Amino acid sequence: MWRGRDVISARDFNRVDLEELFEMAKYMEKYAKSRVEFLKGKIMAVAFFEPSTRTRLSFEVAMKRLGGDVIGFWGAEGTSVEKGETLADTIRMLDAYSDIIVIRHKYEGAAKLAAEVAESPVINAGDGAYNHPTQAMLDVYTIWREFGTVDGLNIGLLGDLRHARTINSLLEILTNFKVRVYLISPELLRPRVETINYIQSRGLMLSFHTNIEEVIHELDVVYVVRIQKERFIDPLEYERIKGSYKITLDTLKNVKKNLIILHPLPRVDEIDHRVDSTPYAKYFRQAAFGVPLRMALLYLILQP
């Protein structure tokens, strides 16, 4: 089911795929701080044209924990890309040297192009402002590990839901489960119409809100993304909106006792640091799950 597959869009995976991935990730948790030889002799090429900390490092650690090796680059500096080499030619070279390619790029569609060119499987580690499928898989895996299920939960997405690529992929993944999603953002920062139309066509229950205080008592999960300052022409408008989409201790006064707060990280100031010490804060555990989740992904794709 997974062997040899590309991971380009969250839309390409169904519930059976995800449940198989989650079970394998849970199995891989016991190896996340050790080394096994499941992928001994395999080489992963990383092509990160954009900055990354958690995604890049967790992929590299995952491959090394599985006994494989890593080659590649982080930024175009010092590569033939600086000389004008095309993306397609760069991918062809990496394909010749490796068994799987992990790519991050600022342009939407870059991962799809890479998959069309390469014979080896390609994993999209984020392209443009739209796709980040492995982050969405990690997010939903964290929910699954915390609650033992995803079905039946009320999930709130808070912040800039238009420009955060994690949001698009997360919504697409969630269409495989029986959940209700609360979209909490300024109207101008709601997800793209195309995304909304797709997830509604898949039967996902949606509601739109502009105030977290009005709905947080109903939520089982709050998934926070930052309000992106660079999207605002008027800095005063940014300051006004930013403060309305922040999680503080006061925000958490009347929440469910088993509420969890997630964030793809890095954060700026959208979650008060005092929230870190509450039982609701699960974003660091979420980040830690990145290694076993990506170990599972690599193993399932490259398994003998």
UniProtKB/Swiss-Prot annotation:
It is an enzyme of class 2 (transferase). InterPro entries: Asp/Orn_carbamoyltranf_P-bd, Asp/Orn_carbamoylTrfase, Asp/Orn_carbamoylTrfase_sf, Asp_carbamoyltransf, Asp_carbamoyltransf_Asp/Orn-bd. It comes from the Archaea. Coiled coil: none annotated. Belongs to the aspartate/ornithine carbamoyltransferase superfamily. ATCase family. Carbamoyl phosphate binds at residues 54-55, 104, 132, 135, 265-266. L-aspartate binds at residues 83, 165, 226. One of its GO terms (molecular function) is aspartate carbamoyltransferase activity. SUPFAM superfamilies: Aspartate/ornithine carbamoyltransferase (SSF53671). This is Aspartate carbamoyltransferase catalytic subunit. Pathway: Pyrimidine metabolism; UMP biosynthesis via de novo pathway; (S)-dihydroorotate from bicarbonate: step 2/3. Its EC number is 2.1.3.2. Gene3D superfamilies: Aspartate/ornithine carbamoyltransferase. Heterooligomer of catalytic and regulatory chains. The lineage of its organism: Archaea, Thermoproteota, Thermoprotei, Thermoproteales, Thermoproteaceae. Keywords: Pyrimidine biosynthesis, Transferase. HAMAP family: Asp_carb_tr. Catalyzes the condensation of carbamoyl phosphate and aspartate to form carbamoyl aspartate and inorganic phosphate, the committed step in the de novo pyrimidine nucleotide biosynthesis pathway.
